[in-house]
Amino acid sequence: MYFHITYSDLDINETHDDDLKDFLIIPEEDIFGQFVTHILDPNENDLYEIEPDKICKNPFSSSIYTNNITIKNKYSLLDANIYEILLSKGISKYIDGLLVWAINFNLLWLLELIYNYKPPINLKDREIYLNSNCDDINLIKFIVTRNDYFQINLESLLEYVDNKEIIIYLMDFIDTDKIVKYVIGNCSSEFFIDCIKGNTILTQEHIKLAVQNRKIPVLEHLINLGIEYDLNEIINDIKDFDILKYMLEIGNSLNEDNVNIIIFNIHTTQLIEYLMNLGYTINSKLVISMFSHMLIVSENTDIVEFLKSINAKDSDLTVDFIEYLLEDNFEKAKQIMEYFPGANTVIDCNLFLKYAIISQDIPNIEYSINKGADLKKYYKNILLTNNVTILDLCLNHCEINDVNNFILKIIENDCIETLKYLVDNNYNIDLLDMFQIMVKKNYYNPIRKYICEQIKNNNLLIPNLVEIIMNLFFDDGDVNWILKYNFEYQYKDNLDEIIMTIIIGDCDGAKNMIMNYNYTSDLKVLYAFILKEFPEECSSEKMDTIKFLLDFNADNNEYVQSAFLLSVFYTPLLKYFVEDKQIDLTVNGQNIVEYLISDGDHEIFRYLYYNGFDVKNNGFEIINAHNSNNECAITKLIESIKNNTYQ
């Protein structure tokens, strides 16, 4: 029994492969796996029971296709009959997937049907698949009351439930303390207060959970119940300002270690100012060390005044702290230099310049230059600003002699304004070298367009341009971005001119050259025609030219055989060989399949199979070919064409 899956609003003949017109089919033993992997929708998909014609088991994947089907039955995915048929036949492969699918769509009747047949399942550690419908009380009750079969870890269900009715229901089946702890962390405070009614034993552990989850009403309720706790044992869990305020307001106090822990955990200037107002001593070194990576500074906090208030000393000021200020506020950094003279040993004008360039702060770039900053240290940073004003300001003070050392970075960061500035100011920019970089690195950005325009406007001749274009073309690279500039081409020989004419898209011109220059039997010419994607209106002209070359070389067996191998890249040509020329695939198909193994084109393999090529009958072992050290015939042929070593 085989199946084909369709969309309900499509005719079955609209669901075949667009090119081959074949159908993806699923054997009965694999059908349950499709429900989850393809996320079938009972309202959008239908299931057809079909009789296949030729069955093609793809050697590169688990997919199975057929060239034609006969419809036997059509089933809705909500039709219990099809599941009854399959389960009664003992089909159980991928049953877990069907279960998950039924749960997702809340199909209790299907779950009941599966439960009645009890095929072997394994949902252990897979409770996550229940998350989509875990708030349905009927589904939960169904699973819990039949958990002798489903074997689901009920405690894990808590991770996906926030329904009060369900959680209270689960309290009869799960350890109450685990539920209470879950509720503290995941549900409202009011819900928690409802849950603990009864004989629930509450401890400091529950207070700690309330602190960790920042639940002040829960914390207040537990403390009002008289639950004992030791502040020193929960201090590391206090990471919320409001929680701390509550704990201090009810009479708790902090020792020196606790203050440092709290500052580290909550790390805001608001907290520090609050603690100072309560009379606590602040560790200025600790606070300053936190500025660069974690301290959250309130909007209304004056950094200089804040440092004064915590009694910061010159020696406390670190490079990280100063860099933080430079990144955030240059003016504050200047004020600190004035108020803390010792900061000048940490801050130098080069550090100022670095961050002024990064933030493109022109006044402070000028300030740094006037202070004697070394511009040479920051050539790269200056060039990557892509800011003409900054470039003009800096490069007027210090000219860059080795600008080409930074070209790659300029290209990578798409700094087109920088490049224009350098060209306009007569820096020695090697545009031809930049063009080679664009080709080699396959960069696509506005710089590429600018470089090509400059080369064109300056009438520069690109060395080996024809070779560059042909190499890109035969490696399936984009050449159109080069062709559109109509650069001057220098051909080494007539063959180069023919290939370039094909690449440009002049089919008639290429055909005339082939005849005039006597290249009718050249494989590189044929390969170029096969690879070139002509406009749709010229597609018949392309095929006619290829047929002309084949007819001209009809007595040249080696040429015809090579053309057949190359047809793997042009399906109309392959069909021409198979359907019009009726080439013997039992003799010739193996080389193509060898190439397809590495290329992964499943469609062409199926086409060959439907037209007579049989892997088994040809004694062709897919695994052996895949692991073989011997290069396949097509790969060898292509390499010989690219390297001009073909005959």
UniProtKB/Swiss-Prot annotation:
Keywords: ANK repeat, Repeat. The keyword Mitochondrion does not apply. ANK repeats lie at residues 123-154, 202-231, 233-256, 258-284, 289-319, 348-377, 401-431, 529-558, 588-617. The keyword Repeat applies. This is Putative ankyrin repeat protein L764. It comes from Acanthamoeba polyphaga mimivirus (APMV). The lineage of its organism: Viruses, Varidnaviria, Bamfordvirae, Nucleocytoviricota, Megaviricetes.
